[in-house]
């Protein structure tokens, strides 16, 4: 009885962790794995945007999120 309860708990917990991992893959891990593709997409999306026109006064100017230090 106790083994079945532990197995059920482990399966539920494992399923939850799998669902969280599946949700985070396209949000976080895919852009890290396909860096050039996302850099090109952002260049297209940001074409024609002047940072000074959209940046609120007093805030740091946004930069390339893929730029590494």
UniProtKB/Swiss-Prot annotation:
Parts of the chain on the Mitochondrial matrix side: 1-8
GO CC aspect terms = extracellular region; mitochondrial inner membrane
Transmembrane intervals? 9-29
Q: Where is the signal peptide?
A: none
Q: Which residues lie on this side of the membrane: Mitochondrial intermembrane?
A: 30-69
Which tissues is this protein detected in according to the database?
Highly expressed in the hypothalamus, substantia nigra reticulata, Edinger-Westphal nucleus, and nucleus of the solitary tract/dorsal motor nucleus of the vagus, the spinal cord, and sensory ganglia (at protein level). Also expressed in the heart, thymus, esophagus, stomach, spleen, lung, pituitary gland, kidney, jejunum, duodenum, ileum, cerebrum, pons, and colon (at protein level). Expressed in preadipocytes and apidocytes (at protein level). Expressed in pancreatic islet cells (at protein level).
Q: Which PANTHER family match?
A: SMALL INTEGRAL MEMBRANE PROTEIN 20
Q: What is this protein called?
A: Small integral membrane protein 20
Q: What is the lineage of its organism?
A: Eukaryota, Metazoa, Chordata, Craniata, Vertebrata
